[in-house]
Design a protein with these regions (language model features):
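Membrane-anchoring hydrophobic helices of lipid-metabolizing enzymes
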Residues: 2-132, 146
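A structural micro-motif
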Residues: 117, 157-159, 266
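Short, glycine/acidic-rich beta->alpha junctions
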Residues: 25, 142-143, 193-194, 250-254
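A Trp-anchored, charged/polar loop motif used as the substrate-binding/catalytic surface
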Residues: 191-203
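A cross-family acyltransferase "interaction/gating" segment
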Residues: 153, 165-180, 204-309
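Catalytic core of membrane glycerolipid acyltransferases/transacylases, capturing the structured
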Residues: 80-103, 113, 132-190
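Cytosolic, positively charged, low-complexity intrinsically disordered regions immediately flanking transmembrane
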Residues: 182-187, 194-195, 223-227
């Protein structure tokens, strides 16, 4: 779950790693306990609001998912601790990859069941073999789950993620994400330093793939408008082509170009999806439009020979 979906910019606590993890785990545990204790109140209230507003009981569905998600997070933390205690070196990495894919799959399946989602996937086999650069559309708070569920778990592909640091607020993402080769970008930090971090991430990529969100942030019509205005004010030669992109933001080239430069001769795999737009923020979810949505996912591969050298 992405805490920025609440409409707030939630930064990881400014403290040492151990202290940060204690804080976030305590927040998750307290939130889950509070939801459980108050369930005799919010369950009937959610039913009454659903009957009154006629929005497919979306508030009740979201509260049920939130209660599950927080409780499942705590259970997963116990399993993560077990992996760290029982496994060593390569065996630990393999176990964490399996646990990561399982965690994502369970979360997505529960969301799918509670919200009545229909998910159709086409071309997932194009993600293998690695190595490759996975370029995924960013439109919802569930986007980080999709590659784990539809690429990593069924095909055994190890994926290295480029994610924003705000996701470290999630204890499972923090612990597993930092134990495996991934990079958490400080979007307010030193850009050259962040790009150097991407180069280090893929310096020994082997048969793994690396995933990045070229847009840099979740899509919205307002963000697209601002991005186009910025390109126009800068007199960018990309302005016309950016206007043709109606359902994605103009890509931020720095990260992708850095990966292409660091990984010459490697294919790119595009991971497109539609139907999750109502998952962008909590206020979008509360509209009820998400219930019964059809989610379409399509992957296609572009050979390195088709990618311009300049």
């Amino acid at each position: 779950m992405d805490p920025t979906s609440l409409g707030l910019v939630v930064k990881p606590p400014k403290a040492r790693v151990v202290r940060r993890r204690i804080i976030t785990i305590c927040i998750y545990a307290a939130s889950w306990l509070l939801l459980v204790l108050l369930s005799p109140l919010w369950i009937p209230l959610g039913i009454l609001i659903g009957l009154a507003r006629r929005r497919s009981f979306v508030l009740l569905r979201l509260l049920l998912f939130g209660c599950f998600y927080l409780g499942f997070e705590l259970m997963a933390l116990v399993l993560i601790a077990g992996v760290f205690l029982l496994y060593r070196a390569d065996a630990r990495a393999s176990a964490l990859y399996r646990l990561q894919a399982w965690w994502a799959t369970i979360n997505l399946k529960v969301a799918q069941r509670l919200l009545g989602l229909e998910i159709v996937v086409e071309g997932a086999e194009n993600a293998v073999p690695g190595p490759s650069i996975l370029l995924i559309r960013h439109a919802s708070i569930l986007d980080t789950l999709l590659p784990c569920v539809f690429v990593q778990r069924p095909y055994g592909l190890r994926v290295r993620y480029v994610l924003k640091q705000e996701l470290l607020f999630d204890p499972c993402i923090d612990l597993v994400g930092n134990a495996l080769p991934n990079y958490f970008v400080d979007r307010t930090g030193d850009t050259p330093k962040e790009l150097e971090g991407l180069r280090a991430l893929v310096s020994n990529i082997g048969t793994d793939s690396v995933l990045i969100f070229p847009e840099g942030t979740r899509f919205s019509d307002e963000k697209r408008r601002r991005a186009l205005e910025k390109l126009k004010s800068q007199g960018s030669p990309l302005c016309d082509s950016a206007h043709a992109l109606t359902r994605v933001l103009p890509p931020k080239p720095g990260g992708v170009l850095t990966l292409l430069d660091a990984l010459p001769g490697i294919d790119c795999v595009f991971f497109a999806h539609t139907g999750l737009e109502s998952f962008a923020k909590i206020k979008d979810l509360l509209s009820g439009e998400v219930v019964g949505s059809k989610v379409r996912i399509r992957l296609w591969r572009v050979s390195s020979q088709e990618i311009p050298a300049e």
